[in-house]
Amino acid sequence: SVQVGQEVAIHMQIKKLNGQLLLDTKQHIKVGEEEQIRAVEKVLQMMRTGEQMQIIAPWYTAYGINGTDIIEPYSNLEIILTIE
């Protein structure tokens, strides 16, 4: 499984619970550096390269009370996460 401090390439699709796609992004990140929301950081450490997981993230493990420019505050989200 992926280790803290390991650099990985991820593909992440973030959706509202109604299925509306909000963000589709590919990134290189370092696991455990808090570069991602808490829900993603926790799941990454349980995954292996090539795996895909579906995460249902409550707002407090996602973008919280502030949200982002495209994600409203207090949004519960579905995240499809792949380690490439």
Residue ranges: model-predicted function:
Residues 1-9:
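Short, glycine/small-residue-enriched coil/turn segments at secondary-structure junctions
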Residues 9-15:
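Beta-strand signatures of extracellular beta-sandwich domains
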Residues 16-79:
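A beta-strand/beta-hairpin structural motif
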Residues 80-84:
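Short beta-strand-to-coil "C-cap" segments at the C-terminal boundary of structured domains/repeats
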